[in-house]
C-alpha cells in the first residue's frame, strides 16, 4: 500500500534530482574553478522555472478572481445606489463617495455591504452581497466536488446571494415642511407579524435557514405566479402585500432571481431563551435573491426593493392617519400575539427542562465525588451499612402498619 502511494512521488523526486546530475557530478575543484556566469549556464534551472511558473499562475488566478468579484460588486452597488438616491430619494446612500468607497469589502472580495438611510417610513436599508472566493480556484473546485458527492459536506461559502434588509421607522413625513409624527414607537408595535412570498424551489431551504419561516403556514393563491407561495403566521396576512402594491408583474419576471420577500419581526436564528427572544424582536423586511447577472436582473431587483418600500409607505401612512382601509386589524394582531406567546412558552419550557437536566447532572456528579471521598477515607462501608439499616426499618414499619 505504502509503495503504491509513495512510489510515484519518489520517482518524481528522483527525476527532479536527475535534472542536475551533470552539475552534481562535478568535483569541488571543478566547481570552484568555474565563474558565477559559467555555473548559471551549466546549472539546469527547469525545476526552479516551473516552480516560479506555478507561483505566477497562483498569483494570476488570485488577482483575476478578486478583480472579477470586485467588478461584479461595483456593477451591482452602483445600480442600487443610483436607484436608492435618485428614485427612492434616500438622503444618504453608501459610505464615502468622494473616495469611491461606496461599499465595504471583506474576506478577499467575497462579502460586500452598503446601506441607505434618511427617508420617510424607512429607518435603513442594508445591502449585502456574497460571492464565491474566485481567488483560489483549486480550493473552490475541491469544495464543489465534495459538495457534489457528499451533500452533508457542502460548504455554504459556495452559495452566491444578495440579501436586502429594510427596517421601518414608523415615521411619516409627507413633505419637507411637514412635522413627523411623535408616536413612532407605538406605530412600530403594529408591525409584529410574518407574511412572505417564497419561491417554491427555495421553500424547504428557506424554512430550514430561517426561524421566522419555520413557524409560518403555507398557502397558494391565484394572485401569485405559479412558482411562488404565501408563507404567513396567520392566513389573513396573505393579502398584505397586494393591498399596498401590485407585485404580480414583477414576481412573474423574477422566478429565477427572487427567493423570498418576507415581512417579519422575528429573528433568523431561533432564540435560546426569553431574553434573547425579547432582544431579537424587530420589524423588518428581508429580500433574498440570486446575484443579478445582467442589466435586466439589476432593474428587476430595484423594482423588488421599490415594492417593499411602497408597502411600508402605504402601511405607515394608514397607521399614522388611522385610515379605515388599514389592512392589519386588531384581530389579526391579537392572533399573531397569541402565536408569539405560544412560541415563547415553548422556549421557556425548553429552558426549564434544560435547567433540570443540568441540575440532575450536577447533583449526580456531586454524589459521585462524595462517594469517591468516602471510599478513599474508608467511610463508605459505614454509610452503606447505615443506609441498609434505614431501608430495613422502613420496610418493617410498613409491614407493621399493614398488619394493624
Swiss-Prot record:
Annotated GO MF terms: calcium ion binding
GO cellular component: endoplasmic reticulum; endoplasmic reticulum membrane
Glycan-linked positions: 44, 98
InterPro entries: CCDC47
Biased amino acid composition, Basic residues: 393-404
Compartment list: Endoplasmic reticulum membrane
Domain of life: Eukaryota
GO BP term, pick one: endoplasmic reticulum calcium ion homeostasis
Residues spanning the membrane: 49-68
Alphabetically ordered keywords of this record: Acetylation, Endoplasmic reticulum, Glycoprotein, Membrane, Transmembrane, Transmembrane helix
Region named Disordered: 369-404
Keyword Ribonucleoprotein: no
Compositionally biased spans, kind Basic and acidic residues: 381-392
Residues with PTM N-acetylserine: 2
Membrane topology: Single-pass membrane protein
Chief site of localization: endoplasmic reticulum
Family to which the UniProt record says this protein belongs: Belongs to the UPF0674 family.
Other comments on record: Present with 34906 molecules/cell in log phase SD medium.
Protein name: UPF0674 endoplasmic reticulum membrane protein YNR021W
Organism: Saccharomyces cerevisiae (strain ATCC 204508 / S288c)
Lineage: Eukaryota, Fungi, Dikarya, Ascomycota, Saccharomycotina
